[in-house]
Structure formats: structure tokens, C-alpha cells
């Protein structure tokens, strides 16, 4: 048991995770080519978050099941299109910006970039958007 505890104490995610994230990028795990006719296409969509702040547990409550489906379908040989987007046309983002005395566009764009990074860090297997 002491040996196992020692190994757990040595785990440093800031050292280990970036290495694997780079490897998975190299392997193209986020790549979707809907023109590839050698694999059947599978489309997956879930609710898009409001870009009004940081991601929180509610986002993962919605994203985790669809992320698992996307991974499973990829393992089955499907070409999975699982886009990530943002519901930036509502009042939550605008109200959050006004509360902070920031222009809503500036606030929304900054939060969308931050959320994209958070999704990547948490290894959500979404397809890159046309902007990425």
C-alpha cells in the first residue's frame, strides 16, 4: 500500500497531461472528415453552453454522456462529427458582461476562447469547428 501511495503522490498532471494531449492531437483524435466515404458518418449534437463565464459541473453533466458516445462510435469505426458551439445570442452572456461593465461582444468572445481551451484540457472529444 505504501508503494501505491508513493506513486499517487508523484502524479503531476501539469507534467503528464500535456504530453498525452499532444500525442492525441498528433493521432488526429479530434479530426473529422465528412467527405471520407471509407467510414460511415455519425452526427452527434448536445446543448451548447452560454459563454457567460467558466465551465462548471452542469456543463460536464450534459457533455459527459455524449462524449462517451462519440468515443464509442469512433472505436466502432465511425467518422464522428461532434461539434462544439456556443449559445451566444441570449441574455445570460449579455447580462454577465453588463454586470462587469464590459462590452458583451468582448466578454462573449473571451469566454468562448476560454471554454474551448477548458474543453481541450478536459479532453472532450469534439470535432474542431470551422474556425479552429
Summary of predicted features, one role per range:
Residues 1-5:
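Basic/polar N-terminal segments that are highly enriched at the extreme N-terminus
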Residues 8-45, 79-83, 112-113:
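Conserved oxyanion/phosphate-binding beta-strand-loop segments in alpha/beta enzyme cores
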Residues 13-16, 58-65, 111:
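Hydrophobic (often cysteine-bearing) scaffold residues that line and stabilize catalytic clefts
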Residues 33-102:
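N-terminal catalytic cores of NTP/NDP-binding nucleotidyl/phosphoryl-transfer enzymes
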Residues 99-106, 127:
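Short, polar/flexible loop-turn hinges at active-site or ligand-entry regions and domain interfaces
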Residues 125-132:
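Conserved small/polar residues in nucleotide/adenosyl-binding loops
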